Amino acid sequence: MAATNTHYYADSMYNMYHHALPPTYYDNTSSSSSYYQSSQGWQPASYQGSSYAHYSQESYSESCYYANYHHQQQQQQHQDQPLCLPTLDAVPQYQVPTIAEPVIETSSPAPVKSRKRKAEESAADIIAAVEERPSTLRALLTNPVKKLKYTPDYFYTTIEHVKKPSKSSSAGELSPCYEQDYAVPTPSTQQTHMSPQRSTGEDVDYLDVYSPRKQAKHGDFITPPPAATTPVDGIGITISTPPQSPAEKSNEINHRIVTAANSSNEFNWSHIEETIASDCKDSKRTRQTYSRYQTLELEKEFHFNRYITRRRRMDIAHALNLSERQIKIWFQNRRMKSKKDRTLEASPDHCTTTGYASLLPPLDATAMPPQTQPQPQPHLQPAAAMPYAAYPAYLPATQQSYDYPQQSPPPPHFAQPYDAQYTPQYHQQTQQQCSYQQQQQQQELNTSNQALYHLP
């Protein structure tokens, strides 16, 4: 009975659902022999001795993917037809040999059946083991994809081109492409599928033929089709071949990222980019604004000490509700501003009497002590005797009232280098220097005018 079926296939789908057709190898009952004995339509002229009792060796070349294509077309045609009783006209293509039946039935059928089952199981194991074909491994070893930031799915991203099936038998029955069902129909996806880099002749893309739907139609798909739920499968399905040049590789990587971000089941990478951008915007420092009270207290501290210690900085930060870093930066900026002001004051353009006097506080009015005390001579008084006479607001014995509270003066050695600038002697010397510079400039201007207008 092992040689009665000349159209044996491993999937046995035809024999499973069509009970009205001739029995297969597994139906080793008396009904099968009676069926073949009752049939009278067998012609010895059409008998081929080599077409049965012989199973070809399993081949795993590229042509094996289309070995059963015509048989699947015939299966679909038989499924469309209603089931009927077996007649000679209904199955004319099956040639039933009855000569070899008595010889095979005399032998023990159980060992043959077990051998066939073992052969089928071994074939299934081999197909599962070599699901990734040797040509694929050879292509990956000879042409490895380098410098990829992702984990490539080599089953879908191999460099493979196969021939199309015959257009006469599959022109109107080809199922839609796998990308149309699972990939998002974005413009970038359509451009990638219809890019001119892919061949448009007799060679088609690897995914266009090896999609799970078409593999199920050809009957070669052993394992269930992968679902597009994992990031690797989702990314691997949307592209076909790895890039060959750096430009193509960057385009393919960008297309993977865009397609994965737009798919419904994938993680939203654009949300991460927006979050990073918003974090960068928030991390930009804003300009610190100080209140009038804070500015006044900082100016008072800067007047006494241009450089403050860390202990004093901590006290000021606690009193003004600021951070130590803000106070440190404020003092740095204030020192730079003071240096810039002194540089501008020392320049010849700012040495006018009225302009310079307007920049300085009224020293003559503030330098006068109360009338009850004798007036000291300015040129005989040392610098350390009265260091803060120019600013009586910080002295407890003064009669003038200000908004900020009175403070006791710090030790005299803190402000000694800066007291000389606010004495009347220093003010008079500076005015004399400015007047001397103005006289020199006027003389130079007169000399240049005389040389210009009194030409020979």
UniProtKB/Swiss-Prot annotation:
SUPFAM superfamilies, alphabetically? Answer: Homeodomain-like
The UniProt entry's GO CC annotations, sorted and at most eight, read: nucleus
Quote the DNA-binding region ranges, renumbered to this chain: 283-342
Keyword match Nucleotide-binding: no
Q: What Gene3D superfamilies does the database record attribute to this sequence?
A: Homeodomain-like
Signal peptide limits: none
Molecular function GO labels: DNA-binding transcription factor activity, RNA polymerase II-specific; RNA polymerase II cis-regulatory region sequence-specific DNA binding
**Matching InterPro entries, A to Z?**
Antp_homeobox, FTZ_N, HD, HD_metazoa, Homeobox_CS, Homeodomain-like_sf
GO process annotations (BP) = negative regulation of transcription by RNA polymerase II; periodic partitioning by pair rule gene
Q: Is Phosphoprotein included in the keywords of this UniProt record?
A: yes
Q: Where is this region: Disordered?
A: 338-380, 400-456
Matching Pfam families, A to Z?
FTZ, Homeodomain
Q: Where is the composition biased (Polar residues)?
A: 444-456
Q: Where is the composition biased (Low complexity)?
A: 421-443
Subcellular locations according to the entry: Nucleus
Question: SMART domains attached here?
Answer: HOX (SM00389)
Keyword terms of this UniProt record: Developmental protein, DNA-binding, Homeobox, Nucleus, Pair-rule protein, Phosphoprotein, Transcription, Transcription regulation
Q: CDD domains annotated for this entry? A: homeodomain
The record makes one more remark, namely:
'Fushi tarazu' means 'segment deficient' in Japanese.
Q: What does this protein do?
A: May play a role in determining neuronal identity, may be directly involved in specifying identity of individual neurons. Required during embryogenesis for the process of body segmentation. Homeotic protein, required in alternating segment primordia, it specifies the correct number of segments.
Q: Which family does it belong to?
A: Belongs to the Antp homeobox family.
Q: What name does this protein carry?
A: Segmentation protein fushi tarazu
The protein's organism comes out as Drosophila hydei
Q: What is the lineage of its organism?
A: Eukaryota, Metazoa, Ecdysozoa, Arthropoda, Hexapoda
